[in-house]
């Protein structure tokens, strides 16, 4: 397994403390990797800053060609990436290969095209004898922090728009699941000029803080927890860096009496538990109108009970383990606290799986109330709650009564109601009669404590640029 850092076009061993990397399906240590030292963090940022002088002036065509080559290499090595993601993250191998790798490849190909479509405005004369124009230019060095749940996918979401816009990047993957990012570094080093992409390894305190606080870094992009986002915003405030934050969610799933119950059950079974629920858009907070509440709970409980947890390399496995022992304990604690309320009923699951690995049973909880922690706080595991509601006004207020604002869905056959409710929901994305579906052409990002800034789409590309005015006297 590739375990070296990429700094200024060279693969080098870390000079810091060694950290274990685990296989969550067994609990065994896969390998130990040395963190980047403070000097190596500085070297990576300075290499990116030096490379920006030339990379930032390349044509969109040149940048697009590099991104397309990287997409091709990822596709050619899809099985290798899927196996690494499966072993390090615990994902079912077939899901990583069939679902994630094609989407990752598509992100790079989309931004290769988008790079050639990004324009400033050629405006006109707003002062006699002077012509104004608007430019969209790259910022410089971007520090990107990728999370442990979709390491390679999130690395793609950050690298592709930043590079397409002409920036240089220093990427720090989560120390829990770094292997696909380190493999990507190995393959990317021969495609991009030295220093354009740098990949480090290490914990937040030892590597993340010196990276994000470095004076040469112009922007920090994070996908992670609210706590990590707060820390980075505070840490970077003295240097007034631009920040791009995607900080999790607690997606409301609003099911009206007229909804297609079979479609809801199928959708939540898939989109509430994909990646063992370790997804910021997971369909985890169901509000069911009272007319269909009992039926939905019964049918959904039966469906969730059929989900198969197992070894990631088993083709029949639908749910793998959670990412770490610490996270398993967090999920277990959240469910135990829900059970202790007395009014929340465990329909299925509600316990750790016996044996090796960090497995938690797919869980459905019914009877949750609006103020319950299981409704208000992100669990980030295979846990879905169901809360009954009376009417449209009540459920919209409840759905919006959350610190999160990333994703939501509405299930109804009434087109007018779908439009009406969608317009009032305070979430970056609202799906109607589906959930979880993302495409490269559309923006992904939240509001409230879920953060700001967009991933994917032309909006995502613009986030990695600075708007400049140039005036010419003639």
UniProtKB/Swiss-Prot annotation:
The entry's NAD(+)-binding residues are: 146-148, 172-175, 209, 225-228, 280
What pathway, per the record? Answer: Amine and polyamine degradation; putrescine degradation; 4-aminobutanoate from 4-aminobutanal: step 1/1; Amino-acid degradation
Q: What is its EC number?
A: 1.2.1.19, 1.2.1.-
Per its record, the protein catalyses: 4-aminobutanal + NAD(+) + H2O = 4-aminobutanoate + NADH + 2 H(+); 5-aminopentanal + NAD(+) + H2O = 5-aminopentanoate + NADH + 2 H(+)
Q: In the UniProt entry, which residues are flagged as the active site?
A: 246, 280
Task: From the UniProt record, give one GO term of the biological process aspect.
Answer: putrescine catabolic process
Q: Which UniProt keywords apply?
A: NAD, Oxidoreductase
According to the UniProt entry, its GO molecular function terms are: aminobutyraldehyde dehydrogenase (NAD+) activity; NAD binding
- Does the keyword field hold Translocase? no
Q: Which CDD domains match?
A: ALDH_ABALDH-YdcW (cd07092)
- Identify its protein family: Belongs to the aldehyde dehydrogenase family. Gamma-aminobutyraldehyde dehydrogenase subfamily.
The record's note on quaternary structure and interaction partners says: Homotetramer.
Q: What does this protein do?
A: Catalyzes the oxidation 4-aminobutanal (gamma-aminobutyraldehyde) to 4-aminobutanoate (gamma-aminobutyrate or GABA). This is the second step in one of two pathways for putrescine degradation, where putrescine is converted into 4-aminobutanoate via 4-aminobutanal. Also functions as a 5-aminopentanal dehydrogenase in a a L-lysine degradation pathway to succinate that proceeds via cadaverine, glutarate and L-2-hydroxyglutarate.
Miscellaneous section: 4-aminobutanal can spontaneously cyclize to 1-pyrroline, and 5-aminopentanal to 1-piperideine.
The name this protein carries in UniProt is Gamma-aminobutyraldehyde dehydrogenase
């Amino acid at each position: 397994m590739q375990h070296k850092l990429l700094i200024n076009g060279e693969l080098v061993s870390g000079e810091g403390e060694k950290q274990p990397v685990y296989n969550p399906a067994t609990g065994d240590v896969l390998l130990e990797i040395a963190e980047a030292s403070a000097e190596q963090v500085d070297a990576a940022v300075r290499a990116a800053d030096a490379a920006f002088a030339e990379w930032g002036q390349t044509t969109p065509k040149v940048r697009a060609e590099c991104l397309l080559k990287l997409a091709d290499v990822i596709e050619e090595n899809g099985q290798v990436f899927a196996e690494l993601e499966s072993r390090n993250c615990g994902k079912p191998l077939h899901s990583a290969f069939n679902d994630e790798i094609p989407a990752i490849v598509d992100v790079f190909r989309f931004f290769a095209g988008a790079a050639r479509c990004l324009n400033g405005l050629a405006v006109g004369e707003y002062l006699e004898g002077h012509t104004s124009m608007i430019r969209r230019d790259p910022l410089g060095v971007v520090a990107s922090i990728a999370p442990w749940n979709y390491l390679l996918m999130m690395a793609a979401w950050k690298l592709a728009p930043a590079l397409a816009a002409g920036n240089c990047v220093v990427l720090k993957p989560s120390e829990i699941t770094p292997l696909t990012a380190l493999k990507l570094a190995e393959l990317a080093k021969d495609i991009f000029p030295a220093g354009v992409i740098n990949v480090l390894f290490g914990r937040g305190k030892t590597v993340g803080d010196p990276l994000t606080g470095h004076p040469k870094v112009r922007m920090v992009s994070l996908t992670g927890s609210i706590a990590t986002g707060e820390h980075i915003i505070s840490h970077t405030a003295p240097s007034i860096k631009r920040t791009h934050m995607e900080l999790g969610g607690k997606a409301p799933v609003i099911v009206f009496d007229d909804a297609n119950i079979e479609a809801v059950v199928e959708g939540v079974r898939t989109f509430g538990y994909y990646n063992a629920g370790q997804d910021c858009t997971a369909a985890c907070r169901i509000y069911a109108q009272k007319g269909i509440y009992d039926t939905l709970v019964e049918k959904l409980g039966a469906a969730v009970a059929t989900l198969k947890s197992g070894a990631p390399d088993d083709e029949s496995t639908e749910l793998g383990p959670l990412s770490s022992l610490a996270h398993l304990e967090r999920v277990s604690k959240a469910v135990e606290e829900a059970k202790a309320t007395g009014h929340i009923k465990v329909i299925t699951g509600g316990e750790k799986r016996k044996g090796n690995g960090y497995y938690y049973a797919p869980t459905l909880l019914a009877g949750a109330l609006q103020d319950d922690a299981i409704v208000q706080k992100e669990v980030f595991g295979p846990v879905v709650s169901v809360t009954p509601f009376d009417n449209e006004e009540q459920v919209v207020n409840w759905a919006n009564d959350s610190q999160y604002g990333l994703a939501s869905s509405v299930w109804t056959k009434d087109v007018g109601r779908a439009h009406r409710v969608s317009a009032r929901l305070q979430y970056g994305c609202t799906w109607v009669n589906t959930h979880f579906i993302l495409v490269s052409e559309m923006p992904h990002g939240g509001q409230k404590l879920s953060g700001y800034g967009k991933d994917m789409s032309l909006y995502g590309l613009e986030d990695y640029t600075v708007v400049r005015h140039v005036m010419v006297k003639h």
